[in-house]
C-alpha cells in the first residue's frame, strides 16, 4: 500500500471523480463528502495532499467556507501537506479571503482540466 496519502474532499460535487487519477499518481486516496468525517480523517492520518472542493454559503456566520475546519486541522496534523482547492469562479472573492488565512498551493476553477490538476502535483 502506498505511503503517499491523499484526502479528496467533495462537498457539492457535480464534477469528475479524480480518484483514479490520484491512484495513477501513486496515492492512496481517502474520499470523503462529509466535512466532519474529513476532519476526523485529517486528525487520524498524515496526508501528503488535500484536494478539496471550496463552497461558500453567505449564511456562514463565523467562517468564509466549508473547508476552514479541515484546513486548520491539516495545519496541525499534516503541516507539509500540499493543498489543492477546486472552486467555482463566482466564489473567487471568498476564496481570496480564505487564502489570506490558510496555505494553498494550487487553486483551480471549474471546469477543472485534468492536465492542470496533474500540474499541481509537480
Give residue spans per PLM region.
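Alpha4 helix (beta4-alpha4-beta5 surface) of REC/receiver domains from two-component response regulators
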Residues: 62-65, 85-107
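Acidic, metal-coordinating helix/loop segments flanking the phosphotransfer/catalytic sites
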Residues: 33-49, 55, 59
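Conserved phosphotransfer cores of two-component systems
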Residues: 43-45, 73-80
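C-terminal output helix
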Residues: 37, 112-121
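Two-component/phosphorelay signaling modules centered on CheY-like receiver
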Residues: 12-31
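Conserved acidic carboxylate
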Residues: 8-10
Amino acid at each position: 500500500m502506498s505511503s503517499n496519502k491523499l484526502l479528496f474532499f467533495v462537498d457539492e460535487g457535480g464534477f469528475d471523480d479524480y480518484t483514479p487519477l490520484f491512484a495513477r499518481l501513486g496515492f492512496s486516496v481517502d474520499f470523503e463528502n462529509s466535512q466532519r468525517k474529513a476532519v476526523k480523517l485529517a486528525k487520524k492520518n498524515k496526508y501528503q495532499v488535500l484536494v478539496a472542493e471550496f463552497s461558500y454559503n453567505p449564511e456562514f456566520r463565523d467562517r468564509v467556507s466549508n473547508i476552514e475546519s479541515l484546513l486548520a486541522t491539516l495545519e496541525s496534523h499534516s503541516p507539509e501537506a500540499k493543498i489543492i482547492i477546486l472552486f467555482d469562479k463566482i466564489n473567487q472573492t471568498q476564496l481570496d479571503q480564505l487564502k489570506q488565512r490558510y496555505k494553498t498551493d494550487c487553486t483551480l476553477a471549474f471546469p477543472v482540466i485534468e492536465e492542470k490538476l496533474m500540474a499541481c502535483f509537480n
